[in-house]
Amino acid sequence: MIDPDGFRPNVGIVLMRQDGQVFWARRVRRDGWQFPQGGMNTDETPVEAMYRELREETGLLPEHVELLGATPGWLRYRLPSRAVRRNERQVCIGQKQVWFLLQFTGDESHLKLDHTDTPEFDHWRWVDFWYPVEHVVMFKRGVYARALRHLAPLAQSLAGPAAVGAMPQRALEAWLPGSSAAGHDSPRKRPRKRSGARAMRINND
């Protein structure tokens, strides 16, 4: 499913412990680390896609997490030109994502990376909240900075300001105009709207 602009609808997951540490995983047979993420099916809502991807990539079920909130609207990033398959009928130039913040309420024994026959990850660990912005592949740094910036107030309400902290300089540079990591809808290319500055809370009822 690719939109008319060439972006594939996708969900991203920030799984956080109560102490503010977030789940960080290594892709199978690759050196790259990232948050869980995945494409939406045509018949899914973003929330439904998020729970499916959570189960497929981490083995966790809805009872192992609490949904704290999500980014408002879509956040986009472009794929590097070498990764764009120009010979396909529908050309995908990037992803447009809704990012979710989940509190991990289960036990670490519930985390099973081999839940499916084709696992996405082969190793995981807990890292500081802003660590992923500095260590994810370069073309995703802008969208990671924007997603975590939106979700940080919710994370701080759970873990406390000291645990989550302020956005570090590296993350700030990914967000600022003119940064090579800023992504498709950086402030330089698409003006920020005041109403989109906060993460929205989601009712679990």
Curated annotation (Swiss-Prot):
Annotated ranges, domain Nudix hydrolase: 6-149
Disulphide-bonded residues: none
Superkingdom classification of source: Bacteria
Biased composition range(s): Basic residues: 187-196
EC number(s) stated in the UniProt entry for this protein: 3.6.1.-
GO molecular function, one term: pyrophosphatase activity
Disordered: annotated segments: 178-205
InterPro entries: NUDIX_hydrolase-like_dom_sf, NUDIX_hydrolase_CS, NUDIX_hydrolase_dom, RppH
The entry's keywords: Hydrolase
Uppermost EC category: hydrolase
Motif mapping: Nudix box: 38-59
Pfam families membership: NUDIX (PF00293)
Family label: Belongs to the Nudix hydrolase family. RppH subfamily.
Function of the protein: Accelerates the degradation of transcripts by removing pyrophosphate from the 5'-end of triphosphorylated RNA, leading to a more labile monophosphorylated state that can stimulate subsequent ribonuclease cleavage.
Name of this chain's protein: RNA pyrophosphohydrolase
Species annotation: Xanthomonas euvesicatoria pv. vesicatoria (strain 85-10)
Gene transcribed to yield this protein: rppH
